[in-house]
Amino acid sequence: MGQKSIFNTNMNIKHYMQKAKLVDTIRAMGAKAGAEAHPDRETVEARLDALRQERRLAARKVSTTKKMAKRGASQEEIDKEMQEITESLSPATPSSHIQVTPLFTTFKITMTVRPPTRRRLDPPNLSPTLKALVDGLTDACWWDDDDYRHLVETSFRYGGLSGTPGEWRIVLDVEEVDPSGYVTSN
C-alpha cells in the first residue's frame, strides 16, 4: 500500500469528503484482495459489482433529490425521477440475492504493520485502515458481518520494515476461534 493509502488516527484530515474518499479507497482494496483470495471468486466479484451499482444508485438518488428540491420541484416530480433512476441504474441481480458461503464465522484478526521507514510507529493508530479493510473483506463475503458476534478480537503488531521505499505492507491474519471463549450475545 502506498503512503497515501494509509489512514492513521493521528492524521489531520480537514474535510469529511477527503476522509470518505480515503476510506472508500482502502475498502475497495480490501474487497479486491478478498475477492481474489476467495474460493468462489466469480460469485464474489458479481456481488461486488452489484454492491458498486447499488452505491452509485443511492448516491445518484441523494444528489438528484437535493438538486430537484433546491429548484422547487414537486414531490411527484421527484418521485417520478427517482423511479427512472432506479430503473436505469439498478443491478440486474441485487447484491442481497447473490449468496456466497462465508469463509469465517467467529474469528479474530491480527494486523501486522510493516512501514517503509524507521520512523516511530504505533500500530494501533492504523485502526481506521484495518476497519476499512475489514469492511472490504465483509463485502467480499469472508464473513457475514464484522460485528461483535463475528469479529471477536483484533490486535496489532509491528512487523519490521517493508523493504520497499514508500510502500507499506499490511498483513491480516484471520483465525477462526471458538465463540465460547468470547461474549457474543447481549
Residue ranges and their predicted role:
Residues 1-186:
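Catalytic phosphate/metal-binding cores of nucleic-acid and nucleotide-processing enzymes, i.e., regions
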